[in-house]
Amino acid sequence: AFEPYYYEEFGAFYSPYSYKDGDTIRSIQLGRKDYDYHYMDWYQIPKLLDSPYWSEPYFDEGGGDMIMTTYSYPIYDQLGHMVAIFTAVLSLEWFAEQVNSIKPYPNSYNIMIGRGGTFLVHKTKENILTETIFATARQTNDEEFIATAHKMVKGESGMGEFERQNQRFCFFYAPIKSTGWSVAVACLHSDIFSSVNNVRKYSYL
């Protein structure tokens, strides 16, 4: 996505965009008057920060027409002037599938939160982009879980425990430093320690 009139012949909104459609790579011209990308976060923020930037997930109406996150990388000319933003987009649905494919135990589930605590990945799809980990933590009335939620947003890593629907979970979390997000896996306490209990049981025989 180029700065206005960098190429005079292409006008103010030159932004060639390629995407995969099945087994075919298609290309379109994304920029236009009713889709002025120069004022969108994925363009403005890396330009202002003068550095690469991962956007918070958003619905890109008129562009990708899906919920996605964008990695933006500023491009400069020989004089050091920024002339364009190179982007790569990830479908949030696809990204969630990759995260959810990691299951240490049959009853495990994963979550991922954005910089402000909004769920980006959650086992309940209705919670994605509409609910925060803070709201969920308050519903449990579990002080340890509430403290863990704040630690995740601060970019810390660690382990916590919480109880939900009369089941005790262990909660392992770590930051994704390049994005400012945090990912966690929740595992049933009984699943984790069942193998330990089995070893103890056989050691007594």
List PLM regions with ranges:
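Extracellular/periplasmic ligand-sensing ectodomains of membrane signal-transduction proteins
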Residues: A1-M66, F119-N141
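Amphipathic coiled-coil/heptad-repeat helices and related helical stalk/stem segments
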Residues: H38-Y39, F95, E144-F145
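Amphipathic alpha-helical regulatory segments at dimerization interfaces
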Residues: I45, E97-I102, T148-K151
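Conserved beta-strands of PAS-like sensory domains
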Residues: G64-K103, V121, C170-A174, G180-S195
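Extracellular/periplasmic juxtamembrane segments that couple receptor/chemosensory ectodomains to their
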Residues: Y76-D77, R115-G116, A135-K201
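Selective recognition of signaling/oligomerization transmembrane alpha-helices
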Residues: S203-L205
